């Protein structure tokens, strides 16, 4: 700790640059869009709430949301999650009327920190159609059990096939739905052997969850492949591009 302080004193330019970068991310502004998730039969099953991040100095340029959430603190991330929950709560009638789910992205540390927020937990209990989508797999603390994580409702796992979300995740937590990353989907489609492996992989994953959702479907051919696979649902630009949250009531309920 003392060494870090000495290093900062001896290198004031780096310290100033760090403060400026932190201030930059704190000045960023958020807006929200939604993207539908369709079952392979064409029925709308859920919508994902997506965060659009911009900076006042260049509001037309979108910044990477994952970088934004990495740069802000856990307490700030909890404020964002609360903001997202409040926004979706205003659309409760839409989700209830059509029997739809809504997913909100969240990282592991923020999810665990939410356990200390009784007001937010009570709000979550009043929204049975809300789902938290983990953007990374988290190992449960030693004093935690899966039962203790169920207070958030059924959990989804995002980006299966990336570094953080892999097979080790399947045995530790019983996820409701698991999303396969587009990168893995595209890689396996490149050869007949890969297509066979993709089908086998989905069969295996279905043993550990209610269904697999394929992300990043961008062409008619990709959508057809997903429909002919053991996948439960899909999401991507071919099905629908993200739209402003204000237009949620215009969602196409069946393709």
From Swiss-Prot:
Residues 13-255 form the EAL domain. Induction: A class 3 flagellar gene, it is dependent on the master transcriptional regulators FlhC and FlhD, and then FliA for expression. Induced in early post-exponential phase at both 28 and 37 degrees Celsius, it shuts down later than class 1 and class 2 operon genes. Expression has to be shut down for adhesive curli fimbriae to be induced, i.e. on solid medium where biofilms form. Repressed by RpoS. Gene3D superfamilies: EAL domain. Its EC number is 3.1.4.52. InterPro entries: Cyclic-di-GMP_PDE-like, EAL_dom, EAL_sf. One of its GO terms (biological process) is regulation of single-species biofilm formation. Keywords: c-di-GMP, Hydrolase, Nucleotide-binding. GO terms for molecular function: cyclic-guanylate-specific phosphodiesterase activity; nucleotide binding. Disruption phenotype: Disruption leads to increased expression of adhesive curli fimbriae genes, including CsgD. Also leads to a severe reduction in swarm size and swimming velocity, and 80% reduced concentrations of c-di-GMP. Disruption of ycgR, or concomitant disruption of dosC, dgcE, dgcQ and dgcN completely restores motility, suggesting these 4 genes, together with this c-di-GMP phosphodiesterase, form a network that regulates cell motility by altering levels of c-di-GMP. It catalyses: 3',3'-c-di-GMP + H2O = 5'-phosphoguanylyl(3'->5')guanosine + H(+). The keyword Nucleotide-binding applies. The keyword Transport does not apply. Changing residue 48 to A: Loss of c-di-GMP phosphodiesterase activity. NCBIfam families: PRK11596.1. Involved in the control of the switch from cell motility to adhesion via regulation of cellular levels of cyclic-di-GMP (c-di-GMP). Part of a signaling cascade that regulates curli biosynthesis. The cascade is composed of two c-di-GMP control modules, in which c-di-GMP controlled by the DgcE/PdeH pair (module I) regulates the activity of the DgcM/PdeR pair (module II), which in turn regulates activity of the transcription factor MlrA and expression of the master biofilm regulator csgD. Effect on flagella is controlled via the c-di-GMP-binding flagellar brake protein YcgR. This is Cyclic di-GMP phosphodiesterase PdeH.
